[in-house]
Design a protein with these regions (language model features):
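Predominantly a Rossmann-like dinucleotide-binding segment in NAD(P)-dependent oxidoreductases
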Residues: 137-203
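Rossmann-like NAD(P)(H) cofactor-binding subdomain of soluble oxidoreductases
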Residues: 89, 109, 132-139
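Acidic-histidine catalytic/liganding microenvironments
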Residues: 36, 59, 75, 140, ...
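N-terminal Rossmann-like dinucleotide-binding module
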Residues: 8-60
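Rossmann-fold dehydrogenase core element
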Residues: 119-136, 154-161
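Short, Asp-centered acidic motifs that coordinate Mg2+ and/or phosphate
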Residues: 43, 80, 158
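Short, well-ordered coil/turn segments that N-cap beta-strands
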Residues: 39, 63, 102, 129-130, ...
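Beta-loop-alpha module in the N-terminal Rossmann-like domain of NAD(P)-dependent dehydrogenases
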Residues: 29, 61-123
Length: 203
C-alpha cells in the first residue's frame, strides 16, 4: 500500500513551470499551463515589463514576474521551463534550464545553428532530462492525415515548399524583429521541413 500511496501523491503534485516569453506563443502556452490541472506556473519571464504585466493580468495577476531569465531560474527552481522567447535565446536558456535539472519545452526552432542544437541535445543526455520542441503539425489531425495519405502515393521525387505569410502593422514589427534573429526558413520553415521528413520516413 505504501508504494501505491507514494505514487498517487506524486501524480497529484503539479509540475512547476517557468514560462519564458509573452508574445503570441508565450501567451498561448502560459494560458494552457494556467488552465490545465497538473501544472503550476512559478513565474513569467520576458524582457518587456509591459508584456509581463499584461499577460499576468490576463491570468489573474497572481504570478511572479521577472525580467531576467537566469535570475528567474535561480529564484523559482522549476521542474520544467517553457521557452517561447526569440530564437536567438533558445540555446542559452535551454542549456541553462537543463543544467539546473529542469525538463524543457522549447518553441521551434530549437536553435539558430546546428552547433547550438547539438549543444542542447548533449546537455539533455548528460543530465537525463527531456527536451520537447513545439512541432505542432506532428500532432495536428489534418496534417497527420495528410502525411498518411501522401505515404500511399508512392516515392516522392520532388518536394517544393512555398511559405507566404502576410504581415502588416504591429505584426510586421514582431516579424521584422524575428527576422533579425534568424531567417524565415529556420523560424517557420522548420515545420514544413519536419513534415517532409515524416512523409519520406527519413526522420
Amino acid at each position: 500500500g505504501g508504494r501505491k500511496g507514494d505514487a498517487r501523491r506524486m501524480s497529484l503534485t503539479p509540475i512547476r513551470v517557468l514560462c519564458v516569453g509573452a508574445g503570441h506563443m508565450g501567451r498561448s502556452h502560459a494560458l494552457a499551463y494556467h488552465k490545465l490541472p497538473g501544472f503550476q506556473i512559478v513565474g513569467l519571464v520576458t524582457r518587456s515589463a509591459d508584456s509581463r504585466a499584461k499577460l499576468n493580468a490576463e491570468l489573474g495577476g497572481g504570478y511572479a514576474e521577472y525580467g531576467d531569465f537566469h535570475a528567474a531560474l535561480k529564484a523559482t527552481k522549476p521542474d520544467a521551463v517553457s521557452i517561447s522567447s526569440y530564437p536567438d535565446t533558445h540555446a542559452e536558456y535551454a542549456v541553462a534550464a537543463l543544467a539546473a535539472g529542469c525538463h524543457v519545452f522549447v518553441e521551434k526552432p530549437l536553435a539558430v545553428t546546428v552547433a547550438e542544437a547539438e549543444q542542447i541535445v548533449a546537455k539533455a543526455k548528460e543530465v537525463k532530462r527531456k527536451v520537447v520542441i513545439g512541432y505542432i503539425l506532428r500532432h495536428h489531425p489534418a496534417w497527420t492525415q495528410f502525411i498518411k495519405t501522401v505515404q500511399t502515393l508512392g516515392k516522392p521525387l520532388v518536394m517544393r515548399m512555398n511559405l507566404n505569410q502576410q504581415s502588416s502593422g504591429d505584426n510586421w514589427k514582431t516579424h521584422r524583429a524575428l527576422m533579425q534573429t534568424c531567417s524565415p526558413i529556420v523560424d517557420c520553415g522548420v515545420h514544413y521541413v519536419d513534415i517532409m521528413c515524416l512523409m519520406t520516413g527519413s526522420r
